[in-house]
């Protein structure tokens, strides 16, 4: 039906007869001529209709926005005075001699001349995707996935699919369950990741595996998360953590070069402990120059108990954040920052303005200055490298509260004062994570997942001191986003059973949930390691949006609902009966859907 795409026409096509298919983006009547901007997935071109071609001209007078049409015409060069430099096709136009109105359009529920609500955009997603910026993002996504496949194929990785209907295993989030009609009362789980299957593929001898795969997690959502998401999943045998990172860094560097024309350079490597100490986050945004400085040793003897208390507590922390030029902040702004850190559990935010660095106590302004000696003040100013015109913010509380609150404050101040270098890229690797962290019930949980190997520990050493164990794990972080994470896996039965035991998984539970894995580990399992990238998040970064829904064709809301199809929906009672399922309303509620499905 077409010979060319609208957005691909240029001066090389002048004089040619072309047939185009697409939509009316805009119509204008000027000087007895009818002009339309015609749009398809590749872009927009100007088409005009002359009264001399009566049939086409009369039809063109009926055109309205979003009519689906086909035209045939001749490509002409625009006069110099009419060239539109804002359009890729701005040097040419089409003189149409035939027009076929394929389908008419009702007035759109979305207004192209104003900002539509996200709810409206998601409800009419098929119309929202017609917008050039949305189409461009999905085209970029297609090019990115194509590049990844070529890279992985060229580096000896095999694209192998793993099951979508599998067994529920504890991986941190809730599973989406699928009832079995054949096996009454039993359920499949949609995979949170292909983790165990890709490890089993290494045990099968496939050596290098990858897959661009859908994963599912029933968890609370935010702007950069979806209940179903796409991973670039990777696993290797006989490669060290350093070797895996080298190949994956090469992939990302070449991807950025291909799509953005940017050389990311070598990625710095930072330990988890250093990232938390300096930036208050295990995914630090290094575009922001601000850093936290521990000052507990300097204030442990001051009379100000807000400082000295946490400074003398093994589980406490006192940290300072120096903001260059921050002395200009008003008291109102400072108070707003105090309220902000309260979100993270901080009871307050101490501050100190350095008006004259050389004047000692006389040169600072702060409610806490009276509690500081000249020596302590000078030590703090030296440690933070404070200068005249700066402000220092202080956090003093438990280690977690201070780290979380001051890390978040660092990001907010960096944005508010335009200190963060927008338009640049700051990748890094974060390594040496703790193997375990405390859970809410006083036990331990795996910081990554229970199949991650510890660094340089035997099963006996790990069992004796699990809280000191360092995981052989690594995360790739770009501009404050964790874009990928991986680890060296456990490849010996004894170590895997030890980890399960530390996590409180009994031997019976181990056999029930992971018997197939424990059996497989007995048969010459090779050392293996891997990583998974969040494809949606990578595309989000590369296309310059801050909402992951912008790079997914048909995303869910933050309530895990599809406004377009009205999913999830109530099931047919007959289908539920066949599955031996009865839906019961929660006590104290009147759920019509539950009654309908009983």
UniProtKB/Swiss-Prot annotation:
ATP binds at residues 217-219, 226, 482, 534-537. One of its GO terms (molecular function) is aspartate-tRNA ligase activity. GO terms for cellular component: cytoplasm. CDD domains: AspRS_core (cd00777), EcAspRS_like_N (cd04317). L-aspartate binds at residues 171, 217, 448, 489. GO terms for biological process: aspartyl-tRNA aminoacylation. Its main location: cytoplasm. Gene3D superfamilies: Bira Bifunctional Protein, Domain 2 (3.30.930.10), GAD-like domain (3.30.1360.30), Nucleic acid-binding proteins (2.40.50.140). The keyword Protein biosynthesis applies. Coiled coil: none annotated. It catalyses: tRNA(Asp) + L-aspartate + ATP = L-aspartyl-tRNA(Asp) + AMP + diphosphate. Residues 195-198 are annotated as: Aspartate. SUPFAM superfamilies: Class II aaRS and biotin synthetases, GAD domain-like, Nucleic acid-binding proteins. The keyword Amino-acid biosynthesis does not apply. Its EC number is 6.1.1.12. HAMAP family: Asp_tRNA_synth_type1. Catalyzes the attachment of L-aspartate to tRNA(Asp) in a two-step reaction: L-aspartate is first activated by ATP to form Asp-AMP and then transferred to the acceptor end of tRNA(Asp). Belongs to the class-II aminoacyl-tRNA synthetase family. Type 1 subfamily. PANTHER family: ASPARTATE--TRNA LIGASE, MITOCHONDRIAL, ASPARTYL/LYSYL-TRNA SYNTHETASE. Homodimer. NCBIfam families: aspS_bact, PRK00476.1. This is Aspartate--tRNA ligase. It comes from Yersinia pestis.
